[in-house]
């Protein structure tokens, strides 16, 4: 009798295969943690954070995928066919990294601040979290602490209970190389990050 293949938890080796440069393998991934090139338009920023388990311990083998709009608020994707927002040929809009090569288990993305999409959504980053023990990947977002007015008007963020919104808002800091936004992703516990059913 034919049936659906049963689901399994995500294993510990997927991040090594999909982010080989981070884990110092000889072959390289086509997708890394840098979304910017020398000609990319927009304000350069760095995103840093950790994935924390239910005990508050950093997860060393999680993988994060990020996709975002460019500085003009347009995605580099065929489904975004708006002509009022310009495409940036030097901005891919997608990146992937793991958490396990440094002592702090940080994920780091070098990118630009995304523009507003024009549909009321505040500038934000879309994330997918994959890690051992999950039956499926999880979707979340990162908003920016210095976009308070735009965040207050965002229709997606407005659906999140006010006492949970802080789990989606990265805090701005000035690092040695420029602007850094920091946000940890909590998988469980009282500070559990809001995940979306997409």
Ranges and model annotations:
Residues 1-198:
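Beta-strand-dominated extracellular/periplasmic modules and repeats
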């Amino acid at each position: 009798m034919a049936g659906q293949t049963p689901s399994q938890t995500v294993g510990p080796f997927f991040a090594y295969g999909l982010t080989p440069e981070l884990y110092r393998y000889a072959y390289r991934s086509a997708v890394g943690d840098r979304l910017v090139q020398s000609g990319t338009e927009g304000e350069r920023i760095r995103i840093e954070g950790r994935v924390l388990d239910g005990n508050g311990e950093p997860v060393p083998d999680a993988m994060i995928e990020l996709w975002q709009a460019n500085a003009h608020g347009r995605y580099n994707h065929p489904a975004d066919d708006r002509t009022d927002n310009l495409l940036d040929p030097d901005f891919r809009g997608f990146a992937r990294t793991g958490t396990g090569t440094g002592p702090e288990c940080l994920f780091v993305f070098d990118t630009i601040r995304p523009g507003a999409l024009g549909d009321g959504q505040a500038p934000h980053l879309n994330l997918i979290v994959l890690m051992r023990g999950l039956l499926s990947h999880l979707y979340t977002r990162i908003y920016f602490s210095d976009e308070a007015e735009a965040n207050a008007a965002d229709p997606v963020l407005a659906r999140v209970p006010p006492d949970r919104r802080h789990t989606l808002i990265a805090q701005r800091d000035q690092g040695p190389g420029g602007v850094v936004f920091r946000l940890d992703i909590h998988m469980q516990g009282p500070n559990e990050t809001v995940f979306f059913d997409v």
